[in-house]
C-alpha cells in the first residue's frame, strides 16, 4: 500500500478519486495511454500524456461533466471487490464493437447535454486484468509441475479469444470510436497513426543444447548412458565446431541477417538467451561461454549484431533469489569473451572495473534481458527479483500448453504487480510464436509444416495489423532434423515471408 500511495499526486481531487477507485494516477495514465496512444494538437505539436484529460475514468457526476469522454468504472478495482471471486469476469462474455468485453456493459450514451460521451464498457479494467496476470494472483492453486499457470485454465482460453490480442483491438476500436464520433475534432486533436507496422521484430533463440557431446561429464554420460560410439565422439571433438551435429548457428544467423537487412536499422534484432550451470536435472547439458565452442558461437553472433540475455535456469525459476547470482556469472563470462574478441578491457584510473569504448559491448554486458527456461516464470511477484538484478526486459510471456497471446496484446507492456497494483519499469515482451509449442501436435493441432506455415503467417499478419512487436522464439537445438523434421525449415520459410511481404529495403 505504501508504494502505491507514494505515487499518488498531491492534488486533493485526484487523491479522493484514487481512494474511491483504488487505482493510482500513474497507472491510470499508463492504461489510457496504452489504449489511446500519443495525442497531437492540430498544429502537429505532441500533447504530453500527463496533460491529456480528454478521457476520464470516473463515476462521479461532477467529474463526468468536466470531461469529453468518460469510461465508467465497473467496480473491479474497489476494495470490497478486488481479488475476490466477485471480481472475476462472467462467462459468456459480452462483446463491444465485436471485441470480447471482460467488464462493464457494451453500450454508450451522450450525457451533459450532448457534451460528454459516456462509455459503459470498462476498457481500463478489462485491459488491466489481462496484462497484469491478475488471474494468476487469484488462482494460486492452479500450477503445473514447473510452477507455471496453465494456459488451459486461463480466461482467454476458456472464453475462446486466446488467438486474439484483444487489448490491441480495444485500442483500435476506441481510437476509431473517438474519431467517428467527432470527439477529437471538437477538441482540436489528432491521434498518432497506429497499426499496419511492426514496432520491432525480435528473433530470439534459447541456447539449451548447443552441442552434441562435449565436456568430461557429458562425454561419460554419452558413452555409458546414451551408448554413443566413443570414436564418433572423439571425431566430433577433434573437428571444427561447425561439424558438431547440434551446431545450427550458421543457418540461424544467416536467416536472421537476411531479415535484419530487409528493414531499417534497429527495427529487427537477433537475440540469444544463455544460461549458466545450475545442477538442476532439466538444465542439461551444462556449458560456459568461456569454452572454445561457445566462444566460436558468440563471435559469429557478434558479426550480425546479435544481443544477449540471461536464460534463467529451472533452478532459479523455482528459487528466484538465485537470479542475481546467475546474472553475475553470465556477465563475468561474457566479459571474458569480449576480452578475447577485442582485447579491450583496460583498467581506468581510479576505477574499480573496466570500460569499453564500443557502445554495443557495454550495453551487452549490462545484460538487461531475460527469459525463463521452459517459460517457467512462476508467481507474478517473482518478477521483482528480475528488477532487483537489473533486468528491464523479460521475454517469457507465452503459455507452453497453448498458442496465442498470453497478455492479450502483441505489444510490450510494463509489468503491473497485481498484488500491489504497482506499475514497474520492467517491460514484458509477449512471444508471438513459440516453436516448442508449434511442434506439439496435441496442443497446436498442426500436423504438417504447411499447416504450421499458414498459421504462423496469419499471426505475423495480425501483429502487423495491430502495430505490435513480433517476437519469435526458436530454440537452437530444434533446428537439428533429428530433434524435429521441419520446424527449422519452417523458421527459414517464415523469415522469408516476413522479408518479402513487409521488408522495407534501405536505399543503397
Region annotations inferred by a language model:
Residues 2-289, 348-357, 400, 407-412, ...:
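Terminal accessory/targeting
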Residues 205, 274, 310-313, 368-375, ...:
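Short His-Asn-centered micro-motif
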Residues 372, 376-385, 390-392, 396-409, ...:
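A structural motif corresponding to the C-terminal lobe/cap of the Radical SAM core domain
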Residues 271-273, 284-334:
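Acidic, glycine-rich loop-and-beta core segments that form the ion-binding/anion-interacting portion
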Residues 257-264, 321-380, 384-385, 391-393, ...:
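CE4/NodB-like, metal-dependent polysaccharide N-deacetylase domain
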Residues 249-257, 291-303, 326, 378-388, ...:
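Histidine/acidic residue-rich metal-binding segments in metalloenzymes
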Residues 319-327, 379-385, 405-410, 482-492:
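Histidine/acidic-residue-rich catalytic or RNA/ligand-binding cores of hydrolases
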Residues 223-229, 289-310, 336-340, 390-400:
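Acidic, His- and aromatic-enriched active-site or binding-groove loops in soluble protein domains
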Amino acid at each position: 500500500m505504501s508504494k502505491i500511495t507514494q505515487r499518488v499526486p498531491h492534488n486533493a481531487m485526484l487523491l479522493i478519486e484514487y481512494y474511491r477507485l483504488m487505482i493510482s494516477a500513474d497507472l491510470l495514465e499508463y492504461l489510457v495511454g496504452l489504449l489511446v496512444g500519443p495525442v497531437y494538437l492540430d498544429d502537429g505539436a505532441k500533447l504530453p500524456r500527463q496533460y491529456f484529460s480528454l478521457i476520464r475514468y470516473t463515476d462521479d457526476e461532477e467529474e463526468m461533466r468536466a470531461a469529453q469522454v468518460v469510461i465508467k468504472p465497473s467496480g473491479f478495482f474497489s476494495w470490497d471487490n478486488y481479488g475476490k471471486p466477485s471480481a472475476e469476469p462472467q462467462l459468456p462474455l459480452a462483446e463491444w464493437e465485436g471485441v470480447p468485453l471482460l467488464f462493464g456493459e457494451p453500450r454508450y450514451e451522450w450525457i451533459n447535454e450532448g457534451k460528454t460521451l459516456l462509455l459503459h464498457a470498462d476498457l481500463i479494467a478489462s485491459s488491466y486484468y489481462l496484462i497484469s496476470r491478475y488471474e494468476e494472483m487469484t488462482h494460486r492453486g492452479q500450477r503445473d509441475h514447473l510452477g507455471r499457470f496453465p494456459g488451459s485454465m486461463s480466461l482467454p482460453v476458456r472464453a475462446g479469444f486466446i488467438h486474439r490480442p484483444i487489448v490491441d483491438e480495444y485500442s483500435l476500436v476506441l481510437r476509431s470510436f473517438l474519431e467517428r464520433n467527432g470527439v477529437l475534432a471538437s477538441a482540436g486533436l489528432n491521434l498518432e497513426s497506429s497499426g499496419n507496422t511492426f514496432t520491432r521484430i525480435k528473433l530470439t533463440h534459447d541456447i539449451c543444447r548447443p552441442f552434441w557431446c562435449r565436456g568430461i561429464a557429458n562425454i561419460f554420460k554419452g558413452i555409458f548412458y546414451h551408448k554413443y560410439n566413443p570414436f564418433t565422439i572423439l571425431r566430433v571433438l577433434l573437428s571444427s565446431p561447425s561439424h558438431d551435429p547440434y551446431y545450427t548457428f550458421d543457418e540461424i544467423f544467416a536467416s536472421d541477417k537476411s531479415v535484419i537487412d530487409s528493414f531499417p536499422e534497429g527495427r529487427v534484432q537477433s537475440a540469444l538467451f544463455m544460461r549458466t550451470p545450475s545442477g538442476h536435472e532439466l538444465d542439461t547439458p551444462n556449458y560456459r561461454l568461456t569454452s572454445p565452442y561457445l566462444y566460436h558461437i558468440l563471435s559469429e553472433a557478434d558479426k550480425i549484431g546479435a544481443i544477449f540475455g540471461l536464460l534463467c535456469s529451472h533452478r532459479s525459476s523455482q528459487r528466484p533469489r538465485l537470479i542475481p547470482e546467475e546474472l553475475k556469472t553470465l556477465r563475468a563470462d561474457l566479459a571474458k569473451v569480449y576480452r578475447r574478441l577485442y582485447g579491450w578491457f583496460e583498467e581506468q584510473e581510479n576505477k574499480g572495473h573496466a570500460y569499453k569504448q564500443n557502445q554495443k559491448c557495454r550495453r551487452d554486458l549490462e545484460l538487461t534481458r531475460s527469459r525463463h527456461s521452459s517459460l517457467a516464470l512462476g508467481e507474478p511477484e517473482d518478477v521483482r527479483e528480475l528488477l532487483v538484478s537489473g533486468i528491464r526486459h523479460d521475454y517469457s510471456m507465452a503459455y507452453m500448453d497453448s498458442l496465442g497471446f498470453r497478455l492479450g496484446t502483441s505489444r510490450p507492456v510494463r509489468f503491473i504487480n497485481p498484488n500491489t497494483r504497482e506499475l514497474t519499469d520492467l517491460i514484458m515482451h509477449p512471444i508471438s510464436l513459440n516453436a516448442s509449442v508449434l511442434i506439439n501436435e496435441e496442443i497446436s493441432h498442426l500436423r504438417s509444416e504447411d499447416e504450421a506455415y499458414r498459421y504462423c503467417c496469419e499471426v505475423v499478419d495480425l501483429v502487423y495489423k495491430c502495430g505490435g512487436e513480433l517476437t519469435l522464439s526458436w530454440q537452437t537445438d530444434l533446428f537439428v532434423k533429428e530433434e524435429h523434421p521441419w520446424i527449422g525449415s519452417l523458421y527459414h520459410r517464415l523469415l522469408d515471408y516476413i522479408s518479402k511481404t513487409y521488408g522495407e529495403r534501405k536505399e543503397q
